[in-house]
């Protein structure tokens, strides 16, 4: 395919036009009085959202240079979303301000590499200042306030704080669509996985269609169990102990399954067979998690263990096991707390080293099942469009709350960024580097100005007033009052604020140092073929 090349100012201005097109669509959503954006979908109902990254992903521009500019800003929003879960609109607004100021200075003759170094040093200084000034999140109310700011809804904030209080900071909070109106919170105690009983005959509570085992032995097998002679020696020992048995294996089938079912129906011996969750290596890892949680061992040929020689000492135990047709819950496994803590540390290290979002998510789920618990927030709404929008807001708010617990909170509403500007005076930079630091100083006020503008206030006046207020005091755009924002519950996680600034500065530096852009040449659409009949073909007179 033929390429088109633009140089110097033409190249940078083309990229900037693309950036502005995207940023102008995204920044209207910033702040408590920000508006929504409607996204057309090829199939189904349109999506209504105020999430920066969702809007950015939908924007495709026609001009090749503008398209590249927009793609670069999408990267800012996506990276901020990946790292912090929120702050995508703030990152986009900061990127736009940094690029606008930077290009103005490049056009005036400043050296782009000098500006880049100045921007990087300034951003590092502001980041360190933000981390130092961050307040630790200690109370449920602080978590609720932070999540409520992200979701724009106090009830959602309170529900997320309640969920985090119950499952701990390591716990998993998932959001599901509900058929009923409003919000509900469901909590799971113990380890739950998405596999139920293999046969309905194992049910002990016919009304609830559940199999409940009190104080059972738990047999974990990495292979299929199909012949009864493999199981018999172990079954006899379990029957002598007078305890029920939960078998979790790749599969339980044939005569092994029918023997368990017959003994259950006759009342001789209570047991339940369940397929192990996951596939391949993930299944092995989850079985090992269960073994550590219940104080048992996985019967596997890899470690030289077989069912025929298995002893009761290899079995895990728990206070209670509840099995439905779809899921199994192990409550209060009898595993050693030090072994569980070691396994948790190992999974946490795997999360740190993983490059794949999917793997990270699955590891996080495993971590939660071992260390915390699982909370499900069920969201309902009047229409499907509203439901999708609400679910998205809750997911963002959950990640926001977790980020707040991780690194602490700073004053929200763009105030923390604006009031970080004085740290730039101590850098002692000169020449183009000092100009680069000044570009950052100007950009730091952009989020607050946009929030003020969206709230119908004069941006310049608000920024001037807030810069002269004590640290942490600023505009509460929801009420229009100037007050102590942390006390008023207007807070942002410092992880979100610093990620937005770092990612915006990274892309802005690339913009400024660009000297040529190579893009695909738009193909001209072929002219439609002429009709040999002169347009009269096929007509019946």
From Swiss-Prot:
It holds the Pfam family Cpn60_TCP1. CDD domains: GroEL. One of its GO terms (cellular component) is cell surface. The keyword Transmembrane helix does not apply. GO terms for biological process: protein refolding. InterPro entries: Chaperonin_Cpn60_CS, Cpn60/GroEL, Cpn60/GroEL/TCP-1, GroEL-like_apical_dom_sf, GROEL-like_equatorial_sf, TCP-1-like_intermed_sf. It comes from the Bacteria. Its main location: secreted. Forms a cylinder of 14 subunits composed of two heptameric rings stacked back-to-back. Interacts with the co-chaperonin GroES. This is Chaperonin GroEL 2. It comes from Mycolicibacterium gilvum (strain PYR-GCK) (Mycobacterium gilvum (strain PYR-GCK)). The gene is groEL2.
């Amino acid at each position: 395919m033929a390429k088109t090349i633009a140089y110097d100012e033409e190249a940078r201005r083309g990229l900037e036009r693309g950036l502005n097109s995207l940023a102008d669509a995204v920044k209207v959503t910033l702040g408590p009085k920000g508006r929504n954006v409607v996204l057309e979908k090829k199939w189904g109902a349109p999506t209504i959202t105020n999430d920066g990254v969702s809007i950015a992903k939908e924007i495709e521009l026609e001009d090749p240079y503008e398209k590249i500019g927009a793609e670069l800003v999408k990267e800012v929003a996506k990276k901020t979303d990946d790292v912090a879960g929120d702050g995508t609109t703030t990152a986009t607004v900061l990127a736009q301000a940094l690029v606008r100021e930077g290009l103005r200075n490049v056009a005036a003759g400043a050296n782009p590499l000098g500006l880049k170094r100045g921007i990087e040093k300034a951003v590092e200084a502001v980041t360190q200042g933000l981390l130092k000034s961050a307040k630790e999140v200690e109370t449920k109310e602080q978590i609720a306030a932070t999540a409520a700011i992200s979701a724009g809804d106090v009830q959602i904030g309170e529900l997320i704080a309640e969920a985090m209080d119950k499952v701990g900071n390591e716990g998993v909070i998932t959001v599901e669509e509900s058929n009923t109106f409003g919000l509900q919170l469901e909590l799971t105690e113990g380890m739950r996985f998405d596999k139920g009983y293999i046969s309905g005959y194992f049910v002990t509570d016919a009304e609830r269609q559940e199999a409940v085992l009190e104080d059972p032995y738990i047999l974990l097998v990495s292979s299929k169990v199909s012949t009864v002679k493999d199981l018999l020696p172990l079954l006899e020992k379990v029957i002598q102990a007078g305890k029920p048995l939960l078998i979790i294996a790749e599969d339980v089938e044939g005569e092994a399954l029918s023997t368990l079912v017959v003994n259950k129906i006759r009342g001789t011996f209570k047991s339940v067979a369940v397929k192990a969750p996951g596939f391949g290596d993930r299944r092995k890892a989850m079985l090992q998690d269960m073994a550590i949680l219940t104080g048992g061992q996985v019967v596997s040929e890899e470690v030289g263990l077989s069912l025929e020689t298995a002893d009761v000492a290899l079995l895990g135990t728990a206070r209670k096991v509840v099995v439905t047709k779809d899921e199994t819950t192990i409550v209060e496994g009898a595993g050693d707390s030090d072994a569980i803590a070691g396994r948790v540390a190992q999974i946490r290290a795997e999360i740190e080293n993983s490059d794949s979002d999917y793997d990270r998510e699955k590891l996080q789920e495993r971590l939660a099942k071992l260390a915390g618990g699982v909370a499900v927030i069920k969201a309902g709404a009047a229409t499907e469009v509203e439901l999708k929008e609400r679910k998205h807001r809750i997911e963002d708010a959950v990640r926001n709350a977790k980020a707040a617990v991780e690194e602490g909170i700073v004053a929200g509403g763009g105030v923390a960024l604006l009031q970080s500007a004085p740290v730039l005076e101590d850098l002692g930079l000169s020449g183009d580097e000092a100009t680069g630091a000044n570009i950052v100083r100007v950009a730091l006020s952009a989020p607050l100005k946009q929030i003020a503008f969206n709230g119908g206030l004069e941006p310049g006046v608000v920024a001037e007033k807030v810069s002269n207020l004590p640290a942490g005091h600023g505009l509460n755009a929801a009420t229009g009052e100037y007050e102590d924002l942390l006390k008023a519950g207007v807070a942002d996680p410092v992880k979100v604020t610093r990620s937005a600034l770092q990612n915006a500065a990274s892309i802005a530096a690339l913009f400024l140092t660009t000297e040529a852009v190579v893009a695909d040449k738009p193909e001209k659409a072929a002219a439609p073929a002429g009709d040999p009949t002169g347009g009269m073909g096929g007509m019946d007179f």
